[in-house]
Regions:
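Beta-rich interaction/scaffold domains
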Residues: 2-28
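Short amphipathic, basic-aromatic surface patches that mediate peripheral association
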Residues: 148-167
Length: 273
């Protein structure tokens, strides 16, 4: 297979080389999660780690920085970090944090760890719109593969309720999925799905989703087939985006999950043709 090396200049103008494999006719989108860089969050916030390549992979750390002011008495910590003991090299460790002790905890009682293809752009008025899922994808996706470990936390919190409820008789689960969606609407305008509509949008075409989000103590491999939504087919004349989305709490977007639920993912890969 052909192995191409791209030089990418990041925002701090350090040139890094990334290796992208293109194997035969089958196009493989692969993230080894070995390379991470420290993101400068500015003088008011603690820095955090972000996976490479930037612009392709993002995390929920960008939102959690508001809970980690450098002079703040209460710091919640960051929900996504590099796991050095990955399945192969580094991996991504996603943790659901109880953020109720922070002044902003009323807005976000829990902060789940999420890793996704796309970009994070903080929207304080509509937090779910901060996660802009998906990157351009020009193949028909067939399989979504990877390895993971998961351990649900013990104190399940429902932050969607006022007042917040905790200690609920619910066992948390992780969420791992890949979604193919149309990149343009009928008038040719760009479509980008966010935390608001990634699970409901009419632009979704196919999805590969892990059915079993329960605890897995040992590294567990998954190989998921893309299933098409009703009345949807792949059309090679259309433009598409592909969103890989992993979360330490499957309902974290609704501020529901267990404190300390931990998902570790590695070697994520989408095979298309």
């Amino acid at each position: 297979y052909k192995r191409q090396v791209y030089s990418v200049v990041s925002e701090d103008v350090t040139s890094r080389k990334y290796t992208v494999s293109i194997e035969g006719v089958q196009n493989i989108m692969r993230y080894s999660l070995d390379e991470w860089s420290e993101f400068d969050a500015g003088s008011s916030y603690d820095n955090y780690w972000t996976p490479e390549p930037a612009g392709f992979l993002a995390t929920s750390n960008g939102g959690a920085k508001m809970l980690n002011g450098s002079s703040s008495a209460v710091k919640v910590g960051y929900p996504v970090m590099k796991e050095t003991e990955g399945f192969n090299g580094g991996a991504a460790k996603l943790v659901t944090l109880d953020s109720r002790g922070h002044a902003l905890g009323s807005l976000a009682p829990i902060t789940s760890g999420s890793l996704f293809t796309g970009v994070f752009s903080l929207n304080m008025l509509a937090p779910l719109k901060s996660t802009k899922f998906g990157i351009a994808y020009d193949k028909e996706p067939k399989l979504f593969k990877g390895v993971y470990k998961y351990k649900a936390g013990t104190n399940y919190i429902d932050g969607s309720k006022k007042p917040v409820e905790e200690g609920l008789d619910v066992v948390d689960e992780c969420s791992i999925a890949a979604v193919l969606y149309e990149a343009k609407d009928a008038s040719g305008k760009d479509v980008t799905l966010t935390g608001v509509d990634i699970n409901t949008s009419e632009y979704r075409v196919a999805e590969a989703r892990l059915k079993d989000g329960t605890d897995k103590e040992a590294w567990t491999a998954f190989e998921l087939t893309f299933e098409y939504f009703p009345d949807k087919v792949y059309d090679s004349t259309k433009e598409y985006k592909l969103a890989i989305v992993c979360s330490s709490s499957k309902e974290g977007d609704k501020f529901k999950g267990a404190a300390n639920s931990t998902l570790i993912v590695d070697e994520l890969e989408v095979v298309g043709e």
